[in-house]
Amino acid sequence: MTSNNTAHRSATKRLFKTCALAAGLGLMSLPAFAGDSALYGPTAPKGSTFVRVYNASSAEISASVGNTNLNEVAPLGSTAFSFMPQGDYTAKLGSQSVPVKLASDHYYTLVNNASGKPQLVEEPPFKNKQKSLVRVQNLSDKSLTLKTADGKTEVVNTVAAKGTGEREINPVKVSLALYDGDKKVTDVKPVALERGEAAVLYITGSGSSLSPVWVKPPVATR
């Protein structure tokens, strides 16, 4: 009898330990999921519009779109994309304001130029997970071609002034340059092209004073 009681007590203790462990794991799982939410941030509601800022000037600026503050933006720096409801807004970049119309499910970059008014540039999202995308946003006053630094291979065919061009390529780290015909205009900072990402080269300025800058994070839906 004593042996049976002892066995019963041992089984009961094991059961309590198992229940306690299960309860502990259950309690731990709640903050774990909460942590995931904090880590990845809120999900954009269906029909949202997405906008970021690229500061092409040599001075830090503050930026906002409507009531959405996009924080301080360093010289030649950019923000991550922020989402908001579609609609008409006033964008403020530094001391300048510009009206913008933002459509649902569209991506945009607001460019703060070194001189002149800010510009709103649409950025179609890139969805190919196997390739990289090189996109050229040519906001300058001349047609330009993006080639390998040695000029032997065209990466993005000639892009007209105020135009856009792009090409999907395999992921690679590459040194590139801008050409006006066969004449090299300027080298471009090397960029590491990642699978499933778009590297967007913004070219601002005019004449012989051009400023090519890669703007990342990329336009990508994941």
Swiss-Prot record:
It holds the Pfam family AlgF. Pathway: Glycan biosynthesis; alginate biosynthesis. It is found in: Periplasm. It comes from the Bacteria. GO terms for biological process: alginic acid biosynthetic process. GO terms for cellular component: periplasmic space. Keywords: Alginate biosynthesis, Periplasm, Signal. Residues 1-34 form the signal peptide. Together with AlgI and AlgJ, forms an inner membrane complex which probably interacts with the alginate polymerization-transport complex and adds acetyl groups at the O-2 and O-3 positions of mannuronate residues. Acetylation of alginate is important for the architecture of biofilms and increases the ability of alginate to act as a defense barrier. Belongs to the AlgF family. This is Alginate biosynthesis protein AlgF. It comes from Pseudomonas syringae pv. tomato (strain ATCC BAA-871 / DC3000). The gene is algF.
